[in-house]
Amino acid sequence: MSAIQNLHSFDPFADASKGDDLLPAGTEDYIHIRIQQRNGRKTLTTVQGIADDYDKKKLVKAFKKKFACNGTVIEHPEYGEVIQLQGDQRKNICQFLIEIGLAKDDQLKVHGF
């Protein structure tokens, strides 16, 4: 009878979450790249979901130099720290993040138009 009660307490998925801590920071979350229309033909590109392990100000500096655009880090009440760049930089950001190894292709979610 005690053997049967032991079966009830066995959880086959108890160890399923082990090993997740071996993944690099931010791999379980998506990086969202959005575009927002401003006045006229002007647009803003926002990048949200980059792990806190990375210095966002240094990333903005690299984006500004590589893409020849202006950018800043803003504090969004819902999304936390968000990188904001002038112009439509969605493809450039995707290529750059994959190139430097910050994200994989399946982690990037591109929104807009």
Swiss-Prot record:
It is found in: Cytoplasm. The record marks R41, K65 as: Binds 40S ribosomal subunit. It comes from the Eukaryota. The modification Phosphoserine is found at S2, S9. Pfam families: SUI1 (PF01253). GO terms for molecular function: translation initiation factor activity. The modification N-acetylserine is found at S2. PROSITE patterns: SUI1. One of its GO terms (biological process) is positive regulation of mRNA cis splicing, via spliceosome. Keywords: Acetylation, Cytoplasm, Initiation factor, Phosphoprotein, Protein biosynthesis. One of its GO terms (cellular component) is cytoplasm. Belongs to the SUI1 family. Component of the 43S pre-initiation complex (43S PIC), which is composed of the 40S ribosomal subunit, EIF1, eIF1A (EIF1AX), eIF3 complex, EIF5 and eIF2-GTP-initiator tRNA complex (eIF2 ternary complex). Interacts with EIF4G1; in specific 5'-UTR length and AUG context. Interacts with EIF5; which in a mutual exclusive interaction associates either with EIF1 or with EIF2S2 on a common binding site. Interacts with RENT2. Component of the 43S pre-initiation complex (43S PIC), which binds to the mRNA cap-proximal region, scans mRNA 5'-untranslated region, and locates the initiation codon. Together with eIF1A (EIF1AX), EIF1 facilitates scanning and is essential for start codon recognition on the basis of AUG nucleotide context and location relative to the 5'-cap. This is Eukaryotic translation initiation factor 1.
